[in-house]
Amino acid sequence: MRKQILALLLCLVLLVTLLPGTALAAKKKNSPPAFRHHEYEHHYQLQDDSYESTDTEGGYRHYVCADCGDEYSYTTDPLVYETNPKTGERVTQAGAYNPLLPSWEHIPDAEPQVFWSKEDNEWRVYLYGSHDDTGVGYCGFNYMMYSAPVYDLSDWRCDGVYLDISEHATSGATVGLFAPDCAYDVNTDQYYLISNEFNAYSVLRVADNPCGPWDEQEAEWYASVKFIYDPSIYIDRDGTIFIAGSCMKTVYNEYPEIQEMVAADDYKSGMSHIGVLMQLKDDLSDGDGIEAISWLPNDARGYLPIYEGPSLQGWVDELGVYVYFYVSYDVGADGSWYNSGLAWLWTDDLMNGTWHFGENAVDESYVDLDYVISGNHGNIVSDTSGRYAVDPTTGELSFTDFPTYAYGNNHGGLARVNGHWIFIGHRQTGRTAYSRQTVAGEVEVYLDGETPVIKPFEFSSSGVAGSMSAYEMVNADRTTWLTPAVDHPAPSTENNNIHSECKDFDPYITASRDENAVHATYVAELRNGSVVGYKYLDFGTDETAVALRMLVAPGEAGTDAEVSVWLDAPTAEAGGTQLGTVSLTADALAASGETETGTDGTVWTWVEEAMQQPVIGVHGVYFVFASASEEILGSFDQFIFSKG
């Protein structure tokens, strides 16, 4: 009888394992991924005779394998290059315009990191970001690397794909690779990449090169993406690893005290993710690998709910504190939602200290702006809606609450590059939220007495360079003033992923991914009242008469129009000066006779007019389009000024 029972049980087990829809099969499907650890042949450790570079003195790194005694060493340059070693000229960052990367490339969420390149024998900036490689969905299944020498942020090199999960997706990801980050452990000479494999895991991998590549089937540590969404990494000098992320309700509801704090908060956006910070164990294979968890308390209220985009900067010497950036959700005076601002917090104790809202030294008092939601506590450092602008009459940076560029999500980080603090974020292009481009600007980092301050940068076409020559060709897609500007939310699935709120009546920048295409990235759907602006153009130190050449394509209706050219602001009331006008009538276009054809078949025409006023110095330049019709009057691709 006993044998019969055992035989029956064995048959039942075999039957269950063969059935396709069983609980056992489901359990196997939902089990953690079978990652393998990266096994190095050597385990190198930094030696006591090593020392790091300063701004003026080079460094030395010496490593010995703890297992076999094998060793190697190398020297590093000073952190600041006074002259470009390739040209011998003084470093100016000329040419480091926005967007920062080639127009066909779309890398949002970029975290800038400065690492020593042993292959190039120089300090380089590496951008670790998502990849909007299709334009029909957030973030593809690969990460694409770009890097540049710290002394020339116009000299970007594509270093190729450094992680691709499109074939194996061992973590179970079905959407794509969201915002990554990377940190260097000087103690082991290794680079740790934390990736966000959406709807599955945040995965920590290791490599011995800042460009990887990292193997998609390897992991040193991982956690549910619901626990750590949009992860960021910081490695302290002693090698301790810290991971920051946004935590979702399904996880923090397991912590009653956190759930109660969030429930009592006045956060109204419906995005109730909150900031989480983890200290990992020295032995990442020990249990869950987590040594301690902090929930980012701050001095203004119990806990800070944030939706996404944390960037754990870590220790900043100039401020004497740890710094943490996050996406700021706030409401403008017109009731519009903004998540284009990135804000910051600071603490003097990473895991146990109080988190304080940072200061940005900009007066943000504004009528009816007392109902902000998560951000805008005077701590915005980057806003790609253009609401932080230099007043042309005073020269002071101010908060205007007037968007001058399509606003949508933003995400980025800070790096000290050749002695200057550079903040990287992204802007929206195309008619969806899936064609974001890397942008940059220089911020000021300093102590005001004992108060840490990070002063934001003005979102500008000239970016880190400060200005562009008016006498060199400017691509129209470099605009950072494109009005009327509207919200750029995630698209719906209707109409080929074009969101109904991305109105047909507003100009936008076309999004091309073909690096060989001609006249493929431009300002499209201009109408009466459209303004396209560029900050800043340098006309030189001598006052001179100028002429303007523009490359335009008329709208389908062939609408007659003209464009007024303004300096400093697009209206006299705002402090602008009209420089001249250019006729875009059918007769003017026909008289030109100088045309070029784009890859998409669009016929472009060069028009040229002498300006009515002489000009000198550095100015914002604004093109104000006018027509008697409300139909689309055309598109705008390039322009250049000439003297005389």
Task: Give the positions of each predicted feature.
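Long, low-complexity, intrinsically disordered N-terminal extensions of eukaryotic proteins, enriched
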Residues: 12, 22-25, 65, 529
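Surface-exposed loop/turn motifs at beta-strand-loop junctions within extracellular Ig-like
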Residues: 18, 67-69, 625-629
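Extracellular modular ligand-binding repeats in secreted and cell-surface proteins
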Residues: 30-83
